[in-house]
Amino acid sequence: MVNEQIIDISGPLKGEIEVPGDKSMTHRAIMLASLAEGVSTIYKPLLGEDCRRTMDIFRLLGVDIKEDEDKLVVNSPGYKAFKTPHQVLYTGNSGTTTRLLAGLLSGLGIESVLSGDVSIGKRPMDRVLRPLKSMNANIEGIEDNYTPLIIKPSVIKGINYKMEVASAQVKSAILFASLFSKEATIIKELDVSRNHTETMFRHFNIPIEAEGLSITTIPEAIRYIKPADFHVPGDISSAAFFIVAALITPGSDVTIHNVGINPTRSGIIDIVEKMGGNIQLFNQTTGAEPTASIRIQYTPMLQPIKIEGELVPKAIDELPVIALLCTQAVGTSTIKDAEELKVKETNRIDTTADMLNLLGFELQPTNDGLIIHPSEFKTNATVDSLTDHRIGMMLAVASLLSSEPVKIKQFDAVNVSFPGFLPKLKLLENEG
């Protein structure tokens, strides 16, 4: 990775932009289009490093995936014709690829090995392996907890499973494995987590029932799958950086078009509204994956907030940049119930606090979150993304509060989810 990036951007930020396609939906669209025999087209996908790893793996399984301007054309022989891979399936830095394919490949019964980069090797997989093994999956990890994951053929059984954590990745691994079971599977969630797998199953003609915190699949649901075209909305997790940037930079007025506002993902909008931020939604569409244009204007005197409970899984990936936003509130804010942050690309509780504290902000890490005090940018210490794309972008947004350039090590980690992030931020500066 590039050792150091100097961020020298000042406000106000003004203009209208779109952000790249949603990462979670792009992964799932590639997976489902690859399972279905025939041609599916995925419009405006995210072609960052993570989603490319998912594409690479399905190509090794025998799926033809072509990139054509702003779309992917997936021509699949169908899951029954998948090849047995004769090399390790490399998932890179992608937890979504690793965990969802652990379930899918177990269901398919394809002998394979999943392995990622150093970061993935440090992220626990037991939360996925436990339910998969209860489904009779033949899957093992190093010390039964870490990659590489070794998968061998088995006959998957349906289960009645109560989730241990509010994790869309764990839920989705179970759901993908359940497609191949001769029995129904029932999942009971602790809190609502992002439901893209459920909505996209339906889009590709796979029956699934969801009511409240209960999700039920039918036996051998894979037999219903059909190819489908899918339009990927803009990623709200990527939009979050521009939302916060506009809120904290005097004189800013930014509009982001075609952003996915699925209610299981739109926690940042709820949080900004609770803090009194000037945010407006318009051009809203309805459907399984609703979208909107979002206008954000600079807002002084933001109110402090307590972020906890069901709000946390709805904003889990945005919490680092939300923590930065909270430093600009008029009182102390808290984030609780966010243990899930510990098993992301980094322990984001610690990395958020450590990097922002280096710049003079005042954050206290706790076992399950952060205490964030009103504070200002005080020093231009060199900071580090620690190869975590969301930490890198959060630090770039923090630089808007500085009168001097900020140096960020390993900044090219942002390419995992947002190639072109910095040019887009500079575009708003130039228009301002």
UniProtKB/Swiss-Prot annotation:
Record bears the keyword Transferase: yes
UniProt keyword list: Amino-acid biosynthesis, Aromatic amino acid biosynthesis, Cytoplasm, Transferase
GO cellular component, one term: cytoplasm
Location(s), subcellular: Cytoplasm
Residues forming the catalytic site: 317
CDD domains: EPSP_synthase
Pathway: Metabolic intermediate biosynthesis; chorismate biosynthesis; chorismate from D-erythrose 4-phosphate and phosphoenolpyruvate: step 6/7
Binding site for 3-phosphoshikimate: 23-24, 28, 167, 169, 317, 344
Catalysed reactions listed for this entry: 3-phosphoshikimate + phosphoenolpyruvate = 5-O-(1-carboxyvinyl)-3-phosphoshikimate + phosphate
GO terms (BP aspect): amino acid biosynthetic process; aromatic amino acid family biosynthetic process; chorismate biosynthetic process
Residues that, per the record, bind phosphoenolpyruvate: 23, 95, 123, 169, 348, 390
Molecular function per GO: 3-phosphoshikimate 1-carboxyvinyltransferase activity
Pfam families: EPSP_synthase
Source superkingdom: Bacteria
EC nos: 2.5.1.19
Stated role: Catalyzes the transfer of the enolpyruvyl moiety of phosphoenolpyruvate (PEP) to the 5-hydroxyl of shikimate-3-phosphate (S3P) to produce enolpyruvyl shikimate-3-phosphate and inorganic phosphate.
Summary of subunit composition and partner proteins: Monomer.
Family as reported in the entry's similarity comment: Belongs to the EPSP synthase family.
Protein name as catalogued: 3-phosphoshikimate 1-carboxyvinyltransferase
Species the sequence originates in: Staphylococcus aureus (strain MRSA252)
